[in-house]
Amino acid sequence: MGVNKALIKQAVKQILVAIGEDPEREGLRRTPDRVANMLEELTNGREENVQYTLFEGSSNMVIVAGIRFSTLCEHHLLPMLGVTHVAYIPSDKVIGVSKIPRIVVKYSRMLQLQERLTRQIMNEVSSATGSGDVMVLTEAYHTCMMIRGVRSASPLVSMAYKGKFNDSSLRLEFLEYIRPFRLNKFLT
């Protein structure tokens, strides 16, 4: 299901009028088009079909850390900006390293809750690799929390893990490895 850009443009014009703006003034004339194009780009994840190639691997933990992402909060349609860290223990094959960031992009290109995003990435990595041993940690600043309401710049951290990552020592090993790539160090 694609984006109905005509309907978005009409709705944006109505919102502009509702907040007391003139949608025909110079700075706003193309805003409905810009918003429609932006929403089309930021919500096309359901159409993303990541192709996986499996390669010979090992049984050692594979980690891709510091994958930057942005997504829209489904409650306020405002951005979340953050990083994702992914680990899995291959059963015997690995996927191409670029596929993990592609999985993150796929699920971040839709209206999201951070906790759901984290689980979706974990489940897709598990499915793509055939591994039941996966851990994902996402950290994000929610602009809906930063610019309205509580006005706090505190990041939200969410984790999803399964299989061997239920062992706290393996989780700690993962967390220790990704420390240099954590949000507070990575986005500054």
From Swiss-Prot:
Its EC number is 3.5.4.16. It comes from Caldivirga maquilingensis (strain ATCC 700844 / DSM 13496 / JCM 10307 / IC-167). It is an enzyme of class 3 (hydrolase). One of its GO terms (biological process) is tetrahydrobiopterin biosynthetic process. InterPro entries: GTP-CH-I_C/QueF (IPR043133), GTP-CH-I_N (IPR043134), GTP_CycHdrlase_I (IPR001474), GTP_CycHdrlase_I_dom (IPR020602). The lineage of its organism: Archaea, Thermoproteota, Thermoprotei, Thermoproteales, Thermoproteaceae. This is GTP cyclohydrolase 1. PANTHER family: GTP CYCLOHYDROLASE 1, GTP CYCLOHYDROLASE I. Gene3D superfamilies: 1.10.286.10, 3.30.1130.10. HAMAP family: FolE. Pathway: Cofactor biosynthesis; 7,8-dihydroneopterin triphosphate biosynthesis; 7,8-dihydroneopterin triphosphate from GTP: step 1/1.
